[in-house]
Amino acid sequence: MGQKVHPNGIRLGIVKPWNTTWFANSQEFADNLDGDFKVRQFLIKELKKASLSRVVIERPAKSIRVTIHTARPGIVIGKKGEDVEKLRAHISKIAGVPAQINISEVRKPELDAQLVGDSIASQLERRVMFRRAMKRAVQNAMRLGAKGIKVQVGGRLGGAEIARSEWYREGRVPLHTLRADIDYATSSAHTQYGVIGVKVWIFKGEVLGGMPIEEPKADKPKKQRKSRK
């Protein structure tokens, strides 16, 4: 059976940036990695209602800098910045070094795979029909300029006895093209029948990296030979 490689992992360093950027020696590496995991888990739990897209972690000179990408920055910041200050203090306690928090707003949540997946999962938990939730997400993404989108759900759909998976696609989703900017994310819906998994692929266009593109040269018209009389 053909298996698919992770669309984000294969594009790291080509069109996708890393979510964690730091260097450490062998003694500190495990502690930093464990700290990053705990910080991410804490933020996912705390900012469940803030439409959290992704968390980028940097570690410059014995400190930690966390960039939170969210569609609702107001919820993260809180009244007069109280909530973000609590987050900063807790992250500093987890990491054991001074922490700095930056907040980046996601302008188009309909084109962010993680936010689309979380939205579908939330609808499934509220007993919305899975086909309706999938089609609505696909239509919104295409309306806002996506080149293609694919949504897949799997589990006991509609409370069925036998689990199955269904998918819906519109436009192009070229997984084999490395320069294709494909946003991929997963989410899960906890329903009374069990867990339903959600996968989302969004194709936003091709990244050509500033390389000059040579246009095909037009063929020169051939000279017609004069016939001998």
UniProtKB/Swiss-Prot annotation:
Binds the lower part of the 30S subunit head. Binds mRNA in the 70S ribosome, positioning it for translation. This is Small ribosomal subunit protein uS3. InterPro entries: KH_dom, KH_dom-like_a/b, KH_dom_type_2, KH_sf_prok-type, Ribosomal_S3_C_sf, Ribosomal_uS3_bac-typ, Ribosomal_uS3_C, Ribosomal_uS3_CS. GO terms for biological process: translation. Part of the 30S ribosomal subunit. Forms a tight complex with proteins S10 and S14. Keywords: Ribonucleoprotein, Ribosomal protein, RNA-binding, rRNA-binding. Pfam families: KH_2, Ribosomal_S3_C. PROSITE patterns: KH_TYPE_2, RIBOSOMAL_S3. It comes from the Bacteria. GO terms for cellular component: cytosolic small ribosomal subunit. One of its GO terms (molecular function) is rRNA binding. HAMAP family: Ribosomal_uS3_B. Residues 39-107 form the KH type-2 domain. Belongs to the universal ribosomal protein uS3 family. CDD domains: KH-II_30S_S3.
